[in-house]
Amino acid sequence: MIMKKLLITIWRDQVAPRFDLTSEVLVATVDSTGEVLTSKTVVLPSVSAEDLCHMVLTEGITTVICGGIEEEYFQYLTWKKVTVIDSVIGPYDRALEFARGGRLEPGAILTG
């Protein structure tokens, strides 16, 4: 069974507007049917794009969903074979819903 491990940068109930200023993330494992198998919210000990990239790699994240992300981090993550869906605006639960169904695209504006 193919599984995806998603990381969504969050701020309150929204996708965080900036990757490099994220202090909280949602990590979810989704199976090939779109069912969420595990989900956890992680409060990061510090705000750091480098630390967040390290977490993405050590946790085996396959897809990052975020608002704005600097080109340097976007290129690094894609070079490491992580899919980055950026410029997403809206509630993070809607982003997860769309990602589960394979319908989330960069630049998506989601309504609550």
Go through the PLM ranges and name each one:
Residues T62-V84:
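Acidic/His-rich segments in extracytoplasmic proteins that coordinate ligands and/or metal ions
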